[in-house]
Amino acid sequence: ERMLKRISFQTAYSLGENLAATCLDLAWHKISEEEVPSPYMAGAFEKEELHNIGLLNTQIPPRYSTSYFNHVWGGGYAAGYYSYLWTEVLAVNIADYFAKHGALDPAVGQAFRDKILSRGNTKDQMEMFTDFTGMEKPDASGFLKARGL
C-alpha cells in the first residue's frame, strides 16, 4: 500500500510539472508584445503565472523554467506543449473504445483505419475522434486512471 501511494505521488508530481510547463507556455503566448516583461523580470512573470494557477512550488524550482524551456520559443512547438498531455488523453479514450468494442474485431480496426489513420491531417482531429468514438469530447477520467491517479 505504501508503495502504491509513493507511485501515485510521483505520478501526480510529474503531471503537475507537465501542467505547469503547459500553462507557462500558454501564458507567454497569450500576452501582447507590450506586456512582455524585460528579460530581468521573466522569473517574476513565471512565478506570478504559476502562483495564479496553483502550481507554484517554492521549495522545488520548475523543471521547465522560462530561461531554458525551448518549447516556448520555437521549433514548431510554440504554445503547443499542451499537445503532449492532450494526445495522451485522446489515446486513452481510443484505447478504452477498443477495449469496449473488441480490440481484435476487424470491423473496429477498419473503422479506426478509415476514420483516423487514413485521414492524416486532412480533417480536424476532434472531428476524427468524434467520428470514431461517438464521443463529443474526451473523458479525462481514463487519463487520470491510466496515470494511477
Listing of model-derived features with the role each one plays in the protein:
Residues E1-L149:
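Cation-handling catalytic/transport regions enriched in His/Asp/Glu
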